Amino acid sequence: ITAGAIGLLAATGNEQVEVGCRPGIGFVATGSELAEPTGKLKPGEIFESNRAMLASMSEKANGRPTLYPIVPDSLDSTVAAMEWAFAENDAVITSGGVSVGDHDHVKPAIEQLGGSLNFWRVAVKPGKPFVLGQIGGKPLFGLPGNPVSALVTYLLMVRPALLAMQGASKLGLAKRPGRLAKALANGGDRRHFVRVTIDDEGEVTSTAGQGSHMLGSLARANGLLDIPPNSRLAKGAEVGVILIDQ
């Protein structure tokens, strides 16, 4: 509720008003190769970054994030972690473990916990493996482990859902109009959300490397540009840039 809305409520004699609750969101990262970012790496390990990144973004959507310990690649560990997170939250967001490999346990964990699976793939790049399910009537969002894929799928599919849980009527992503500094093409069969920067004059530039593991180009970007499948956007084209910081 904004200050202006509070003033209007007071001026019209409304002492109490119904509001949507801020949802509690549990964040679970899976992967035996992951290490907490507070220690030292062992051979074959990488620091886990998705929980902190996504928790920060969820706070902008009025979520109340709780970060749970990293889960090793085993079905029993995944089931236990998800059960713990669901007991304490209104929704759970996992990262990693949503593909079809031997070490991907999120989908079988949903089944073991008596949940339902709505879908598990989306036609976007980055971010093809994405799980939407329910356990005990609460939503589970299973995001890819690659950081850029996790951010893109969060923005496109999780953020609107979190807002809807609070009764919000405006669920769309904020965009800024701009024009392309250089031509961009998408030769694939999925929508490609390219990391870009948009400056104060509205000039839109790709951040170069677009691999789903490249956090450096993500850190430089302030927006995403949706390029349809098998299409090319010419230099100077008028475009709408999805703002990342929302």
Regions found by a protein language model. Give the residues of each.
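Residue-level signal for inorganic ion chemistry
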Residues: F27, S58, I93, V196, ...
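A general structural motif
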Residues: I46-R51, V71-S77, W120-P129
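Short beta-strand segments
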Residues: F27-T30, T94-S95, A123, L143-P144
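N-terminal small/polar loop signature for handling phosphorylated ligands or for N-terminal nucleophile
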Residues: A55-H105, A109-G114
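Flexible glycine/proline-rich
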Residues: A109-Q246
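Short, glycine/charged-enriched hinge/interface segments at domain edges or termini
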Residues: I1-P72, L224, L243-Q246
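A generic local secondary-structure boundary/capping motif
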Residues: T12-V19, P43-E45, M82-E83, W120, ...
